[in-house]
């Protein structure tokens, strides 16, 4: 079954919520995207005479017809909170201080009329200048919060927490064992690794990139675990797998999970405990800095495919940092843009 929520779209310009659009929605089962398209075209009355590469199978298509609905999913599917646009001001066309600046976005329904040559040039307005000046912000009040417990004896080791549900109160007991200095050090020294905390049986780990496979060698020194200097494999790296856009385009969840299993094997071979991947942001532009790390412009496809790849990686005992799932679209000047 497919949740009805999967058929919704975010209406950024009118309602500002997730909507069910009026009309027919088609679901099909097929071996690949081409066969899926042919199935739906067949339901619409098309044949190979209309340019299809092969006849589709109308019996494999389910059609659901809806009236326009901007109410049912005006609250978040998972939390029940009101759906609001947090970043409307990032759109020049909706930013109140844009002045005469406008941007024309590409549209598949009017491709020739919306493709504009050259880079978009914007003129600085006074309000834009004022809004981008960094200002001090008041820290939120700590009223109502309790200082955490540190260094409380409990005799729990990290391995005891394997498989314990995230909401289990045993985690509170486990965390209360740690001292302030231990927590400060693990936070301050966490770039592509985590430090050891011997008192709870936590080893030092190597956690490294990336979304297309491991980037480090199985070698001496800082790259991976140490090996014999005469080991003929010491400078070998793991496989670089196809970029995530290509992986998602297969729409083959079983194959994607197998890719994850292979990445997990490579990660163990390179001495990884954790992988800085996968990339969960969505494609907003072909010129974004991390397009190769992300799966799709479709959030549903991104989530479904990534889940299977993550399951594959973690089946080998390698934990996954699902990273860059929001606000990471630009590499140029990335350190200077807030």
Where in this protein do the model-derived segments appear?
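Glycoside hydrolase catalytic-domain context in secreted enzymes
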Residues: 1-10, 21-28, 33, 81-338
């Amino acid at each position: 079954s497919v949740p009805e929520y999967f058929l919704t779209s975010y209406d950024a310009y009118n309602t500002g919520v997730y909507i069910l659009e009026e009309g027919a929605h088609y679901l099909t089962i097929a071996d690949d995207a081409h066969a899926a398209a042919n199935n739906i075209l067949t339901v619409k009355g098309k044949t190979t005479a209309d340019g299809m590469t092969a006849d589709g199978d109308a019996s494999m298509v389910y059609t659901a017809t809806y009236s326009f609905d901007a109410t049912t999913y005006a609250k978040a599917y998972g939390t029940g909170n009101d759906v609001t646009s947090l970043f409307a001001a990032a759109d020049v066309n909706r930013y109140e201080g844009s002045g005469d600046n406008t941007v024309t976005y590409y549209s598949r329904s009017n491709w020739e009329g919306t493709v504009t040559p050259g880079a978009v040039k914007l003129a600085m307005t006074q309000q834009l200048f004022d809004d981008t000046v960094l200002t001090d912000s008041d820290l939120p009040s700590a009223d109502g919060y309790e200082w955490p417990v540190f260094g409380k004896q409990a005799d729990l080791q990290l391995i005891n927490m394997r498989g314990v549900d995230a909401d289990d109160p045993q985690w509170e007991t486990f965390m209360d064992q740690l001292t302030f200095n231990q927590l400060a050090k693990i936070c301050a020294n966490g770039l592509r690794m985590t430090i050891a905390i011997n008192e709870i049986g936590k080893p030092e780990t190597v956690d490294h990139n990336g979304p297309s496979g491991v980037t480090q060698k199985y070698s001496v020194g800082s790259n991976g675990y140490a090996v014999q200097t005469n080991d003929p494999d010491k400078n070998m790296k793991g496989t670089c797998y196809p970029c995530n856009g290509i992986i998602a385009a297969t729409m083959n969840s079983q194959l994607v999970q197998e890719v994850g299993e292979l990445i997990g094997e490579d990660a163990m071979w390179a001495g990884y405990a954790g992988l800085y991947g996968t990339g969960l942001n969505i494609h907003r532009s072909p010129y974004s800095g991390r397009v190769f790390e992300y799966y799709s412009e479709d959030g549903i496809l991104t989530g479904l495919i990534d889940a299977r790849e993550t399951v594959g990686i973690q089946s080998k005992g390698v934990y996954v940092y699902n990273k860059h799932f929001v606000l990471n679209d630009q590499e140029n000047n990335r350190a200077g843009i807030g």
